[in-house]
């Protein structure tokens, strides 16, 4: 009789995805981030669920309820710190996962890649609405500034903003609906993750040399299940260290002050993981232009597969393209730094140069160098 895990309708799905999945034998630790993102999502949903049991989404009590969680709920401080810093680890893993995809040409699995970009946008939306919930100064003003960007949409902009706010300013209606969204979106993300995996398993994983690996596949379990487990231990250790020793390292001090519509903080800025996009938004001295640049900074990932010109898949054997990739990484770091700086000389011009370079690398330089490298190979 065949094994139950191979015949049972439900277990068969899990078996084909986690046990008997044929996997390239040479995938490196850069392939660990998919499972780490799954772990992040599960940990965020669990800690978030317990926080939601004690949180109240009303402007008069939201800030106090978060303080109550940290002071009076059993291990509430720990749950909150894990949830807040878990978001940072989520984005660290996301950026490394995307960087891996760009470096090794994984984006040529177009459906998987595009669902991945949609997942990225969903996680960004989730993090944004979540940041509003503690109802501190940066929560309130961040919500005001970012939702206000929609007023740049021609003709319907103002109506759109008031519709999202549920009134004429960020108020109780806004907080209540943002809590509803923040509870809902992670489950949408989980659903989209299933699709992401479904499409990935149609083709199988890519690998560091970018060649077809059908001739050399090994079962996912035990080899990669244990490799993933090591990644889990490392990440959970790092998350625990951050949450226990430096819980407020990545937060904004302004968020310890309850929201006050009458007092604007000196520097309104998002969490560190949105700073690169915020820098691109601010580098254009026009509202609609800035909003379009902000959207494009993420959606540009969708055109990467279309602009792939090289005959080789990854950058493993392409030194010039490798240089461009690391320039992109450096550029992202510069943009992240600029996003947290005030709008004054020399930060304005640095941000504008970095923004132009960011789009040039994706849309011009990479396709050009890919084409050039093909010519060199022929020569």
Swiss-Prot record:
Residues holding heme b b562: 83, 182
Listed InterPro entries: Cyt_b/b6_C (IPR005798), Cyt_b/b6_C_sf (IPR036150), Cyt_b/b6_N (IPR005797), Cytb/b6-like_sf (IPR027387), Cytochrome_b (IPR030689), Cytochrome_b_C_euk/bac (IPR048260), Cytochrome_b_N_euk/bac (IPR048259), Di-haem_cyt_TM (IPR016174)
Pfam families tied to this protein: Cytochrom_B_C, Cytochrome_B
Superkingdom of this protein's organism: Eukaryota
Matches recorded under SUPFAM superfamilies: a domain/subunit of cytochrome bc1 complex (Ubiquinol-cytochrome c reductase), Transmembrane di-heme cytochromes
GO cellular component: mitochondrial inner membrane; respiratory chain complex III
Keywords, comma-separated and alphabetical: Electron transport, Heme, Iron, Membrane, Metal-binding, Mitochondrion, Mitochondrion inner membrane, Respiratory chain, Transmembrane, Transmembrane helix, Transport, Ubiquinone
Entry GO MF terms: metal ion binding; ubiquinol-cytochrome-c reductase activity
UniProt GO BP: mitochondrial electron transport, ubiquinol to cytochrome c
Assembly and oligomerization: The cytochrome bc1 complex contains 3 respiratory subunits (MT-CYB, CYC1 and UQCRFS1), 2 core proteins (UQCRC1 and UQCRC2) and probably 6 low-molecular weight proteins.
Reported function: Component of the ubiquinol-cytochrome c reductase complex (complex III or cytochrome b-c1 complex) that is part of the mitochondrial respiratory chain. The b-c1 complex mediates electron transfer from ubiquinol to cytochrome c. Contributes to the generation of a proton gradient across the mitochondrial membrane that is then used for ATP synthesis.
Other notes: Heme 1 (or BL or b562) is low-potential and absorbs at about 562 nm, and heme 2 (or BH or b566) is high-potential and absorbs at about 566 nm.
Protein name (database record): Cytochrome b
Organism: Anguilla mossambica (African longfin eel)
